[in-house]
């Protein structure tokens, strides 16, 4: 059994399994498609885990908040037990600064203009000839307006 062949049902039912592709050879088209599919499914799997984590984190915060209110006011609202307040939108994701980003380097680096290489197969006379032919066809096929 090759390392690159793992049944897809086994991949996503068990999150501990990852596909392995050796880095010392080129991938064929089948391996590339399997790797793309695997990457998409693992990304979806990770997003599901993040949503699940946020849900339980919000639920824990709401239970803590409702417990604090219940102690102060003498009663506890049933909002968390019925799941009404658990449907709030998740908090925005906080970005982590990139430690390798150097704004001074980016500002100092100037982009030099790219020199285009002339196409050795470009024939301007042939282009003109094709344009003339297409204009003649368009003139013939265009309806005469009165």
UniProtKB/Swiss-Prot annotation:
Composition-biased stretches (Low complexity): 77-92
Segments of this protein annotated with the region Disordered: 67-93
Superkingdom per UniProt: Eukaryota
Protein name, as recorded: Uncharacterized protein ZK673.5
Native source species: Caenorhabditis elegans
Top-level taxonomy: Eukaryota, Metazoa, Ecdysozoa, Nematoda, Chromadorea
């Amino acid at each position: 059994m090759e390392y690159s062949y793992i049944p897809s049902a086994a991949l996503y039912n068990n999150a501990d399994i990852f596909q392995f592709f050796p880095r010392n050879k080129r991938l064929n088209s089948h391996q590339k498609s399997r790797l793309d599919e695997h990457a998409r499914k693992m990304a979806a799997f990770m997003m599901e885990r993040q949503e699940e984590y946020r849900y339980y984190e919000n639920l824990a915060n709401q239970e803590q908040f409702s417990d604090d209110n219940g102690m102060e006011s003498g009663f506890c609202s049933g909002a968390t037990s019925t799941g009404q307040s658990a449907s709030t939108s998740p908090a925005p994701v906080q970005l982590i600064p990139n430690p390798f980003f150097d704004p001074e380097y980016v500002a100092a680096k100037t982009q030099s203009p790219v020199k285009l290489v002339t196409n050795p197969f470009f024939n301007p006379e042939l282009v003109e000839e094709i344009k003339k032919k297409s204009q003649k066809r368009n003139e013939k096929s265009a309806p005469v307006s009165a």
